[in-house]
Amino acid sequence: SVQKFYNDLRSQGIPVGKDTLHAYLGYLEDAFLIRTIALHTGSERQRMVNPCNAYPVDPGLIPIFERTGRPNLGHALETAVLVELERRGLQVAYVRTREGFEVDFLAMSPPRHPVLIQVCLDLSDPTTRDREIHALEAASKEMPDAMPLLLTLDSTPPQPPLPEPLQWKPSAAWLLDWKGE
């Protein structure tokens, strides 16, 4: 988010204004280098106050934006899922629950039911597993008409199995599964 980037720059002693950073973000979008998705909410004020999540237009651009120098496969997988959702012509937003948990995507295409999508590289770390599942569960309780879906890079089902009504699918199978309905 712009706020995080602003805080990072300020902590490094680099003077910059938030308006300038928002303008630069707009330039990057105009140049088709990044895309942003907004918070799903009925309140325009809430949407404006909460930062948009930014993603590169192509997972291959992630090393350019990644400052640690390490590969970020989780972010690459999220970006690939977002690109596919947009290719499918779905409206995409992210969800923040009342508890403060975030779900990566809410994909909507009326009259179909919305789909809550949480993307996770793998669930082998118990802390990661708990965080990802708890966020998806909380969002599915707040949006009972939405199908909660967890996508992972792993091709083996998570153990122990996910609680109802959460569904799991390997990301590769999901990416290849669109029927255009």
Positions of PLM-derived features:
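Short, charged, amphipathic alpha-helix that recurs within catalytic cores of restriction-modification
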Residues: D122, R129-P144
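Short active-site-adjacent structural elements
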Residues: V103, D125-T128, P157-P161
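Hydrophobic, well-ordered secondary-structure elements that form the walls
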Residues: L85, D104-F105, I117, L136, ...
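Accessory nucleic acid-recognition modules appended to NTPase machines
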Residues: S1-H113
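Conserved beta-strand segments of alpha/beta enzyme cores
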Residues: Q91, M147, P165-Q167
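Domain-level recognition of nuclease-like catalytic cores that cleave nucleotide substrates
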Residues: L153-E181
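Active-site ExK catalytic segment of metal-dependent nucleases
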Residues: M108, P114-S124
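Short, hydrophobic beta-strand segments that form beta-sheet elements in well-ordered domains
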Residues: P144-L153
